[in-house]
C-alpha cells in the first residue's frame, strides 16, 4: 500500500467554493517519494469532517500525539470550536492527500467475531514494513496553506489521537502497463479498453 496521510484545510469562508470543482483538483510532487493531491467533497458531505478530523498534530507516539493535540486545543480554543461546527464544512474544505511510494504494508487478518457467527477483517501494521503514522511533508504543506489562507489545518482523528496511520488506498493502485496484458492503465493514466475514463 502507499504510505499515506490524510489531512484537511478548512477555509474561513465559502468564497472559494472549493466544492465546485472536480474531486481531485491539483497535485504536486514535493520530493522523489512524496506526492500530494488536493481533493474536494461535494458541498453536502459535512458529516465527514465531524467524524474524521482533529486539530493538526505533529509527530509522536501513542502517548505524545494525543498530548500534542490537547495542547493545540488549549492554545487555540476558538479555532478548535470553529473546527467542530460541521455545517458547511465540506463546502469550504480541501482534503490534503499525502502519498509516498515507499515499500510498506498493512497486514489483513481474519478474526472470529466476539459475539455471533462469522469472522471480521482487521488490519495491523506489517511488522517488517510498517506504514508511517506521520509524514512531515504533509504537515508542512497543511501548515503552509493554513498560514496563507487563514484556514484551519486538520489531521485524521485516528492519527492524532491514537497514532494509527490512515490510507485511502489499502489495496494499492492500478498497475501501469504497455497493454491490457500487463496492466490496467497506460502511462497517461488511461484505462485500457475505455474512452474518457481516467
Regions from the language model: what does each represent?
Residues 94-97, 120, 125-198:
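A glycine-rich dinucleotide-binding beta-alpha-beta segment and adjacent secondary-structure elements
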Residues 51-147:
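C-terminal catalytic lobe of FAD-dependent flavoproteins
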Residues 30, 88-90, 100, 115, ...:
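A generic structural signal for short, solvent-exposed coil/turn residues
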Residues 3, 13, 100-102, 178-180:
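Short, flexible loop/turn elements at secondary-structure junctions
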Residues 1-2, 106, 172:
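Glycine-centered small-residue hotspots that permit tight backbone geometry or close packing
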Residues 9, 18, 107-108, 184-186:
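Short helix/loop capping segments that flank catalytic or ligand/cofactor-binding pockets
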Amino acid at each position: 500500500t502507499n504510505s499515506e496521510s490524510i489531512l484537511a484545510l478548512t477555509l474561513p469562508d465559502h468564497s472559494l467554493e472549493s466544492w465546485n470543482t472536480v474531486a481531485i483538483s491539483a497535485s504536486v510532487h514535493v520530493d522523489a517519494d512524496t506526492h500530494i493531491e488536493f481533493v474536494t467533497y461535494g458541498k453536502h458531505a459535512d458529516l465527514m469532517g465531524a467524524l474524521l478530523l482533529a486539530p493538526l498534530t505533529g509527530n509522536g507516539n501513542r502517548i505524545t500525539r494525543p498530548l500534542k493535540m490537547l495542547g493545540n486545543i488549549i492554545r487555540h480554543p476558538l479555532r478548535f470550536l470553529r473546527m467542530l461546527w460541521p455545517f458547511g464544512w465540506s463546502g469550504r474544505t480541501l482534503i490534503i492527500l499525502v502519498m509516498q511510494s515507499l515499500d510498506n504494508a498493512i497486514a489483513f487478518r481474519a478474526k472470529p467475531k466476539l459475539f455471533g457467527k462469522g469472522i471480521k477483517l482487521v488490519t495491523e501494521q506489517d511488522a517488517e514494513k510498517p506504514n508511517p503514522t506521520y509524514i512531515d511533508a504533509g504537515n508542512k504543506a497543511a501548515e503552509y496553506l493554513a498560514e496563507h489562507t487563514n484556514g484551519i489545518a486538520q489531521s485524521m482523528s485516528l492519527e492524532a489521537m491514537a497514532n494509527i496511520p490512515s490510507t485511502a488506498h489499502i489495496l494499492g493502485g492500478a498497475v501501469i502497463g504497455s497493454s491490457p496484458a500487463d496492466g490496467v492503465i497506460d502511462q497517461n493514466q488511461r484505462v485500457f479498453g475505455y474512452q474518457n475514463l481516467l
